[in-house]
């Protein structure tokens, strides 16, 4: 597993240092939140309700069953702005997995940091609520340091995840419309 120094910087001042399995070349902005599920990271990351959020998973190891095809996803891509895990398995052991969590994030241009104390991060979020955050390479501290955190509440997230045209999911005897 490759180790590129990376960090999560919270608007409240805390900095959590870890590593990325791939090079992070820019700053990624989002709202730091946590998820306590033991399984279902593909469903969580593709869930449109996580759009613009940097998701910290509290379960100790993530990625152990890899990523399956899109049929099990909540949408057609990763919606989260970033992924934070304590320990990352890069060699998934599941018959139906098509790739690792790390390769999926890299292909999707979504930053992934491992080696962070997600319990400590969860306590900060629990005590202060969801907080604006930046993911960046640790060696990029002196360059391009943007102190302008993004307020996710000022973005029209619903418009970004909604379909703009009707979508036919399946044909059949009855016509069902979802609005």
Model feature map: region roles:
Residues 1-179:
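RNA-binding accessory domains that recognize and position tRNA/RNA substrates
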């Amino acid at each position: 597993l490759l180790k590129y120094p990376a960090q999560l910087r919270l608007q409240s001042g805390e900095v959590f240092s870890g590593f990325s399995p791939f090079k992070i070349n820019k700053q990624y902005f989002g709202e730091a939140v946590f998820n306590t599920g033991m399984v279902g990271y593909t469903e969580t990351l593709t869930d449109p309700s996580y759009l613009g959020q940097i998701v910290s998973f509290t379960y100790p190891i993530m990625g152990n069953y890899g990523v399956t095809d899109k049929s099990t996803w909540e949408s057609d891509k990763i919606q989260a702005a970033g992924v934070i895990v304590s320990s990352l398995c890069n060699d998934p052991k599941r018959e139906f997995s098509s790739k690792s969590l790390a390769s999926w994030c890299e292909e999707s241009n979504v930053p992934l940091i491992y080696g962070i104390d997600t319990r400590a991060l969860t306590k900060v979020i629990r005590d202060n609520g969801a907080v604006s955050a930046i993911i960046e390479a640790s060696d990029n501290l002196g360059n391009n340091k943007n102190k302008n955190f993004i307020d996710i509440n000022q973005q029209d997230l619903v418009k970004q995840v909604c379909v703009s045209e009707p979508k036919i999911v399946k044909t059949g005897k009855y016509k069902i419309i979802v609005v």
